[in-house]
């Protein structure tokens, strides 16, 4: 019953609730004080921890590792305990606070449950969402839709967030990403490029003007790009053009049928990106 309540509250949380809850902390504290890092224990999964360490060292954050197995016997196995020991040793070596819990159950459900008491979910992107109907069964999609926390995906090695590309379409979801972008620009000195593709030409100007005014309010200088192409360019291509090492965007928008037929920008980005993608719900 408790699990069902957590899942329900998380899935029905309003867009903007995460940002509103952290507006004060944004000016007085760090934005990411507790970070959830699910780990399979496989070699590539450790990239997520290394990215978490980059963030923790800048944010003075606590890292909460999570290794999920199917049975109690697996949880008590040497393999699971080795994952825990390695996680905590890497954190100690980096002078970062970090502990790992071994849990039993469904991976997606456990991640959503644990995310409630953290500020960010950081995951290694091994199997990005596919296309067509298969996209609806993607664990990443489920986490994005049902968790009230933003999700940072790591497809390859960790990056320092030196240059960020913000995909901004004026939606409430994109405003969440704008909030994080402004924070990184102010506190991390991240260089920012704002890219807008959706809408007619007049709307694009209005949309970018909103982002410009918001960033200028926070004394953030940025590059502003408006797409002149009829067909939207993949965000990873634009990120590469401007040498960005981070993409920020809102989560899925529009109806699911449209996303299946045409494809969601989030899913398309996750399939082709080689740099971390910060997705705001």
Language-model regions: role of each:
Residues 1-20, 51, 110-158, 239-281:
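Gly/Ser-rich helix-loop-strand patches that form or flank binding pockets
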Residues 61, 96, 149, 190, ...:
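A short helix->loop->beta-strand "cap" motif at the edges of active sites that frequently abuts
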Residues 86, 90, 94, 142, ...:
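Alpha-helical structural signal in soluble globular domains
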Residues 98-100, 151, 222-224, 277:
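Generic structural signal for residues in well-ordered beta-strands
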Residues 62, 71-101:
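N-terminal positively charged helical leader segments and presequences
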Residues 80, 84, 137-140, 208, ...:
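Amphipathic alpha-helical segments in well-structured domains
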Residues 102-109, 227-232:
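Charged docking surfaces used in two-component/phosphorelay signaling
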Residues 3-78, 146, 159-227, 234, ...:
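Small/aliphatic-rich secondary-structure junction motif
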